[in-house]
Amino acid sequence: MSKIIGIDLGTTNSAVAVMEGSQPKIITNPDGGRTTPSVVAFKNGEIQVGDVAKRQAIVNPETISSIKRHMGESNYRVKANGKEYRPEEISAMILQYIKKYAEDYLGETVNDAVITVPAYFNDAQRQATKDAGKIAGLNVQRIINEPTAAALAFGLDKLDKDQKILVYDLGGGTFDVSILELGDGVFEVLSTNGDTHLGGDDFDQKVIDWLVEDFKKENGVDLSTDSLALQRLKDEAEKAKKTLSSANEAQILLPFIHQNLNIDKTLTRAQFNQLTADLVERAKGPVQNAMKDAGLSFSDINEVILNGGSTRIPAVQDSVKELTGKEPNHSINPDEAVALGAAIQGAVITGDVKDVVLLDVTPLSLGIETMGGVMTKLIDRNTTIPTSKSQVFSTAANNQPAVDIHVLQGERPMAADNKTLGNFQLTDIPAAPRGVPQIEVSFDIDRNGIVSVSAKDKGTGKSQKITIQNPGNLSEDEINKMVKDAESNEEADKKKKEEVDLHNQVDQLIFSSEKTLSDVGDKLGDSDKKPVQDALDELKKAKDSNNIETLKEKKDALEKAAQALAVKLYQQAGPQSGAAGQTGKAGQAGPNSDGKTGDDGKTVDGDFKEVNPDDKK
């Protein structure tokens, strides 16, 4: 089986790794980065991904970032490039870029991947991630939770050690905490909790809000309505946040943020901590809930692992230390651990890594709506997956011909307060008094955490089964169409690059040809130089017209003409260089030479003696 790459599809940054020998290795991107910004931009019809997209975000309004926060939102669309894109499509562009540079590194086609998701992602978000992989041309072998992947990266070389681990994962847009037990190569998740809308972006937003409010007070101008100003503020807020992880203050300088007005502020670490205190506090709840669900106290925890770039914030580290009573373990890179863990899981699937078993859990309870709008749970949160569970229900009215199955995910007692995963109907139930029909509802969760539900009339044997497909989720036809679109975009991008390369070659050829003509001067006649000059003029015209085929044709013509000119120069240089080796005027023997000159002044053969270098010693 070919290699399975591990991808951390992050809110702010993404990373990819592969197993090499006994250890996972991060694959660097074309810019040399170990992580790639999860940013997509559209420029003149071209799709840009990663560093190049992020660099021009300030000047390009068609730049999309943090799309992960909208995965699974059925009605969310991004307008760009004259089209509307779903979050899955934008994510697929990031995955496609990662797939390409992984292939360049490995020197082979990559078909399979393990992709990570926040532990607290619901079914719709997981399915959307899997769809994004499919659109990008990847067979998603497994969806695994980010904290679990980080634990794999941490524990791969500690398989013989029994320990309980708390993984605190605060990324760019999501927060997870998982409690795991490691022993004899088994990584068992005991519980998980989190917040899919808490991350580094929220810390940035606090700084942005502070700057906007302060600027409005001082100048009476509201920058929150200026998209260009907001992008500049976002960039500076992120830089200030990173600076404050190692320094006590950060300078924020934004000249001409509005007309001739500037921002010149100093943000201290103490101010930043005050601005973001509620976010740090908000992260404590999921930690406490996860510990409670695992049935453990903090004294039972052997290691606290920090994962995600936002765990570099000193106030976050202090909060974790205060809450758990333990010094966090910094042995793994918080930006890379998840991708490394995903690569390990890929190697477990291929059989390249043995003696490792991963037992993950479902993050949220699953059930159906029953009489009175109540949610009746069939599978409780933190149940080890894969799993299945069945329960028998009945009709709510006499002679009821059909049963509507409303599938829910969440922890609230009332159906309306939970997440709807889907609806389906079991029909043709024979007429019978209320409570008599026996309807067996079965839930099945696979290793990816994706849910299937079936309902069966035990009296007739009639059944109905669905893999949860929200109305907003992608159908197979839609996915196939997007796969084709992605492939055509790849072809268009390839064509665009070829055009750019051609233009660069043309510019170089024009420059070198003009230089050659200038250097030739009077060494050759106009008749020799004319074919090159004519071909050069033709190529310049073709360059202005931007007709690719004509440009190729004229480029080839100039190259041939320039080559012919070079041959003539070489031929002329031959006799000249031979003559230059003599010390007299052309046509005469040099002084003291043994050459003889005829009466007509022409040079005739002269005697010469070969000098042996040894004779000079």
Swiss-Prot record:
Induction: By stress conditions e.g. heat shock. InterPro entries: ATPase_NBD (IPR043129), Chaperone_DnaK (IPR012725), Heat_shock_70_CS (IPR018181), HSP70_C_sf (IPR029048), HSP70_peptide-bd_sf (IPR029047), Hsp_70_fam (IPR013126). One of its GO terms (molecular function) is ATP binding. The modification Phosphothreonine is found at T174. Keywords: ATP-binding, Chaperone, Nucleotide-binding, Phosphoprotein, Stress response. Pfam families: HSP70. Residues 573-590 have a biased composition (Low complexity). The keyword Nucleotide-binding applies. Residues 573-617 are annotated as: Disordered. Residues 596-617 have a biased composition (Basic and acidic residues). Acts as a chaperone. Belongs to the heat shock protein 70 family. This is Chaperone protein DnaK.
